[in-house]
A protein has these predicted regions:
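Domain-edge interaction signal
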Residues: 1-97
Length: 97
């Protein structure tokens, strides 16, 4: 896990002002498309992660560890939504280098 990856996940969560519109699936897709665009333009990805095929789309292999790290550092809060989805709340501004 690199710091840019952790910061990017925190940044996306922070910029989504309505947590009910950003669940795990959308977060994963944002990361996938970001990696895809950067790969085409620079031949590198932001996350450096591999993606695992899941029923609802590709999932970054290390996303759970990233989210747990952000939550343990009190940078985000993760809660369950009404339909058993995950809701992400940013508790502090993300570090942008």
């Amino acid at each position: 896990m690199n710091d840019k990856y952790i910061s990017a996940v925190h940044f996306v969560i922070d910029k989504c002002k309505d947590p009910y519109k950003l669940g795990s699936i959308k977060l994963n897709k944002i990361l996938l498309f970001t990696d895809g665009i950067l790969l085409m333009k620079t031949n590198k990805t932001l996350t450096g992660d591999t993606y695992i095929k899941k029923q609802r789309g590709p999932v970054p292999k290390n996303i759970s560890a990233i989210l747990n790290k952000l939550e343990s550092e009190n940078l985000i809060s993760i809660r369950k939504g009404n339909d058993n989805t995950k809701l992400f709340f940013s508790l502090k501004e993300p570090y942008i280098s």
